[in-house]
């Protein structure tokens, strides 16, 4: 069965409820959608970070939790960019 919107939203809620999210939690979301290329993953992580940034502060237990989640999104973006650059350098 394919990963659907209700599962995605459930994972988002669980992630926001989690005190200390790790990069593996962020990568799980992209992996669940089986995103095919690093470029698409970069855009997905950027949109995910943008979405978390738009959440009201009251959704998070405190500012530190919010900043941690945003930082994990940024780490995922950075790793996906590195993967994309490696993929491009292999083509040369």
Curated annotation (Swiss-Prot):
InterPro entries: T3SS_TyeA, T3SS_TyeA-rel, TyeA_sf. Keywords: Plasmid. The keyword Oxidoreductase does not apply. The keyword Cytoplasm does not apply. Belongs to the TyeA family. Involved in the control of Yop release. Interacts with the translocator YopD and with residues 242-293 of YopN. This is Protein TyeA. The gene is tyeA.
